[in-house]
Design a protein with these regions (language model features):
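Mg2+-dependent phosphoryl-transfer enzymes with acidic/Ser/Thr/Gly-rich catalytic loops
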Residues: 1-5, 23, 193-297
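Active-site phosphate-binding/coordination module
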Residues: 21-127
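Anion (oxyanion) recognition and catalysis
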Residues: 34-35, 99, 170, 231, ...
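Short active-site oxyanion
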Residues: 37-41, 62-63, 151-153, 215-216, ...
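Short loop/helix-cap segments at secondary-structure boundaries that form the rim of catalytic
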Residues: 55-56, 74-76, 166-168, 229-230, ...
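Short hydrophobic/aromatic-enriched beta-strand-loop microsegments
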Residues: 62-68, 176-178, 236-241, 254-255
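Conserved acidic, metal-coordinating active-site core of Asp-based
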Residues: 108-220, 224
Length: 297
């Protein structure tokens, strides 16, 4: 088989957002891939603390993980093998902006998500979403970065406020990526990393460490923060539930996350199974847990 690794997004790609773990067909397919010598790479906007609970993956043990949208790549044990943390200036500017307008802001550190602004909003939202691995600690003392710098940030605000940020601080070149859908109170959610950073950079870092090329990789995702890796992988696929920008970046569309699209792709590419294609069924939005929330995540 020409491909050596499968890099899969987590939420609404490997498993439906809000469910406790990947569905059995996906778990079986990933384990079969690994038994045949393929490497499974979890690629996510989450930091390592958001994916380290083995139970949340239904028995899947990833070989590597591209975390924080490419800003930190780790091995199975969580050891960092490549990283691109935020600078002090980038972090302080985000804090100043979100404090001025009372927007929720968290930073993704090695050990946990720390909410530097509007902790209660973030914590309550995570509890409502009930997505395994997602929660934050109260970081409003704003001192965790004195130990080491975060790899990424996460903020909630109306979309027009992102433009206001860029008007004031565009010189920093921070990369904002919307994740999920707009919720009932008009807020959108954004993963934020250094300029030029995305999952494609993380995938390139990992391939270099493994002695592989990007042509050896298959990448699959569903939303804006996946576009970087979808564009650089040897073969790319977007879930049928994916966003228009993700669909525009890929070689092909596969089945919805709720019909085990990743499992079908593995069977096709590694085991000569039928071509993985969407069924055409309308499953509705895969982000219902966010869209129905108001005043919280």
């Amino acid at each position: 088989m020409q491909y050596k690794i499968l890099a899969s997004d987590y939420d609404n790609t490997l498993m439906p957002f809000g469910e406790a773990k990947p569905r059995p067909a996906v778990v079986k397919a990933v384990k079969k891939l690994q038994a045949a010598g393929g490497k499974f790479v979890l690629s996510t906007g989450r930091s390592y603390p958001g994916i380290r609970d083995k139970n949340q993956l239904g028995g899947i043990r990833y070989d590597y993980a591209i975390t924080c949208n490419g800003a930190c790549v780790v091995d199975r044990q969580g050891n960092v093998i490549a990283e691109h943390p935020l600078t002090s200036e980038e972090m302080y500017v985000l804090v100043d902006f979100c404090e001025d307008y009372n927007y929720p802001l968290q930073f993704n550190f090695r050990d946990a998500y720390y909410a530097y602004c509007e902790y209660e909003y973030l914590h309550t939202g995570y509890q409502m979403m009930n997505s395994p691995g997602l929660d934050c600690v109260d970081g409003e003392d704003q001192d965790r970065h004195l130990v080491d710098m975060p790899h990424a940030a996460f903020a909630a605000m109306p979309p027009q406020e992102v433009e206001r940020f860029h008007e004031k601080y565009g010189y920093l070149g921070l990369h904002w990526m919307q994740t999920g859908a707009q919720n009932a109170d008009g807020y959108c959610y954004y993963d934020i990393v250094r300029g030029g950073m995305d999952k494609g950079v993380g995938l390139a870092d990992l391939c270099a460490q493994m002695g592989l090329t990007l042509a050896d990789a298959v990448a699959v995702g569903d939303s804006a923060n996946d576009v970087g890796m979808l564009k650089v992988a040897g073969l790319s696929a977007c879930m049928a539930n994916g966003t228009p920008d993700a669909k525009a970046a890929v070689d092909r569309i596969i089945g919805d996350v709720r019909e085990d699209g990743v499992a079908a792709l593995i069977e096709e590419l590694w085991f000569d199974g039928p071509r993985a294609e969407p069924s055409g069924k309308d499953f509705g939005s895969a982000w219902g847990n966010i869209e129905s929330a108001g005043g919280s995540l």
